[in-house]
Every structure is written in structure tokens, then in C-alpha cells.
Design a protein with these regions (language model features):
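Conserved short alpha-helical segments that host acidic/polar catalytic motifs at enzyme active sites
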Residues: 1-177
Length: 177
């Protein structure tokens, strides 16, 4: 199995691997890690090859990462526009374009909220994004909410997923709000 470890910025470490989630957790020793938030993703590839590089989350900027459920129809055009702005891409994945767009907007001076709001007008398709920064994370859905997003909140955590089943094994999920 392929594994890729990247350190991005000062506060985010991106670990990518292919295989069952339980195997990837064991491979990286995630159970022993500490942090304020984690973004995980189980991918069903539709737009690009199944490779470690194509695995989520994606980052194209300091202390920013994105995981995506959905499909962007304008990612090829937007990728070319962002390349002209100096954004670098490592894959042909549409999710990396979304991460690149947000990183570019932040570099241009937008707040995360402004960048996310702008993405609703620029990114064409159906999607749910989870975006992680060094200070927290945000979830955003396309304007007509084609892709699901569910949330579980307890006194100890807040978790988002694209399906209820993904939250079943979290501690206290049966009593989550």
C-alpha cells in the first residue's frame, strides 16, 4: 500500500494512505495522536485515479486542507485560471482545485468565511466540503445541498460526515445532538 506524509504550514499534518480506514489508522498510529481536530475521508474515486496522491484531504496552502464529497463540473477551467495566479497542483483531482481556490482567496486577503461564501458562486457542481485550518474547521454544501452532511455534537466533540453510519462508532454518538 502507498503512504504519503506531508507537513503543511505550522499546525497541520496531512497523512494519506490507501486501504480500509482501520488499517490506515493503525499504520499511522492515529489512536495515540493528540490534536484539536482531525479530518478523515474514505474516497470513492470518480474524477481521477485511485492513488495516494489522489487521496483526501488536499492542501494547496499553508495550514489549510480540504476533503470533498461530490463533483465539480468546472474544475478544469478553474485549475487553469488558478495556475495563472500561481497556484500549484499535483493531481488532476477536482477536490484539489477546490482547495486551491480557497487557499488563493485566503492569500488574496479573504477570511475563511469570505472564501467559503465566494466558493458558492465560483465552484460549479454538487459538493460538501470539510475545510480544516490551524484554528478549526468548517463545513459547506453546494447552494442546493445535493450532497448530505450530518453532524453529531457532544460535550467532548463535534463531528461531521456525509452519512450517518460514519458517526456510529464515535464515543457517545448514541446520545449526540
Amino acid at each position: 500500500p502507498e503512504v504519503s506524509v506531508m507537513s503543511v504550514g505550522q499546525s497541520i499534518e496531512i497523512l494519506k494512505g490507501m486501504g480500509l480506514p482501520v488499517d490506515v489508522i493503525a499504520r499511522f498510529g492515529l489512536e495515540g495522536m493528540k490534536g484539536s481536530h482531525i479530518i478523515g475521508h474514505t474516497r470513492m474515486a470518480t474524477e481521477s485515479a485511485v492513488t495516494t496522491e489522489g487521496s483526501h484531504p488536499f492542501s494547496t496552502g499553508m495550514d489549510l486542507c480540504l476533503a470533498h464529497n461530490g463533483s465539480l463540473s468546472n474544475h478544469n477551467r478553474l485549475r487553469e485560471e488558478l495556475k495563472r495566479e500561481g497556484v500549484k497542483f499535483n493531481t488532476l483531482n477536482d477536490s484539489e482545485v477546490a482547495a486551491g481556490y480557497l487557499a488563493w482567496r485566503l492569500k488574496e486577503g479573504d477570511t475563511l468565511k469570505e472564501a467559503l461564501e465566494s466558493s458558492l458562486d465560483v465552484l460549479d457542481g454538487f459538493y460538501t466540503f470539510v475545510v480544516g485550518t490551524k484554528n478549526g474547521f468548517a463545513v459547506i454544501r453546494d447552494p442546493i445541498a445535493c450532497k448530505p452532511a450530518v453532524m453529531a455534537e457532544t460535550d467532548d466533540y463535534v463531528a461531521f460526515a456525509s452519512e450517518y453510519h460514519a458517526l456510529d462508532d464515535l464515543p457517545g454518538s448514541a446520545n449526540a445532538k
